[in-house]
């Protein structure tokens, strides 16, 4: 085994360990909530029981989504993910609709900043949806309670940018540097034990497969993750 093969093996093992760490969090939450429901010594109201069951459901969906994204990554080289014109406003609204319940459960709000013009972009719907879901998931755990996370579409030169802005803790330098260097490996951040950066790694991999590029802007009161996509020459009729 030469040095390059050894380094690749170490990188793959590191990615596996970080992925396992990311999976551990939702599974631990599900286990703890299940124990609470089954504890005969703990009195739980009907409303609290409904809330716990909803949290188990949402947490399970997050874990399943993570597994599905990792499966897609393993097939990126072999599978053909077709690129097509996609309405940027529609996919943003779809993501907000899908993840809003998760934000409500954590006393947070996510909204789409409406735009007059519907930009058509060239992308794969499922891959782009996963990118935006991972950006939103990252924003959920880094934003402060009772703050709004905002998804926005804007024009940047010849590209269309979809960004997710959160208001909370400053982005760890380890994740910021990894994105800036286009480092296609998950990065663990000690200041965010609940988020290993695996979602950003997934977003980066999917963006590359679509010929797009992700980036991040650090703010004193949060961060903005974005993806720059090619604009479609086809006119939007919506």
Model-assigned labels for residue ranges:
Residues 102-112:
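Short conserved segments within the C-terminal catalytic ATPase subdomain
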Residues 171-185:
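Short conserved segment of the HATPase_c
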Residues 138-140:
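Short helix-loop "hinge" at the ATP-lid/N-box region of the Bergerat-fold HATPase_c
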Residues 77-82, 120-123:
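Conserved micro-motifs of the catalytic ATP-binding
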Residues 58-63:
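Short alpha-helical segment of the dimerization/phosphotransfer core of two-component systems
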């Amino acid at each position: 085994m030469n040095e390059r093969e050894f380094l690749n093996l170490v990188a793959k093992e590191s990615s596996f360990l970080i992925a396992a760490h990311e999976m551990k969090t939702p599974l631990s939450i599900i286990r703890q909530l299940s124990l609470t429901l089954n504890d005969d010594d703990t009195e739980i109201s009907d409303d609290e029981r409904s809330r716990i069951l909803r949290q188990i459901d949402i947490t399970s969906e997050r874990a399943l989504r993570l597994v599905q994204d990792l499966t897609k990554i393993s097939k990126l080289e072999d599978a053909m993910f077709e690129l097509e014109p996609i309405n940027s406003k529609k996919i943003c609204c779809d993501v907000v609709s899908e993840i809003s319940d998760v934000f409500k459960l954590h006393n947070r709000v996510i909204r789409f900043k409406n735009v007059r013009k519907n930009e058509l972009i060239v992308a794969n719907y499922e891959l782009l949806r996963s990118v935006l879901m991972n950006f939103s998931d990252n924003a959920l755990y880094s934003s402060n309670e009772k703050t709004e996370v905002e998804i926005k579409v804007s024009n940047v030169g010849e590209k269309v940018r979809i960004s997710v802005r959160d208001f909370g803790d400053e982005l760890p330098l380890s994740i910021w540097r990894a994105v800036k260097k286009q480092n296609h490996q998950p990065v663990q951040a000690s200041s965010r034990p609940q988020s290993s950066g695996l979602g950003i790694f997934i977003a980066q991999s999917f963006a590359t497969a679509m010929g797009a590029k992700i980036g991040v802007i650090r703010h004193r009161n949060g961060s903005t993750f974005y993806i720059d996509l090619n604009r479609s020459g086809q006119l939007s009729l919506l």
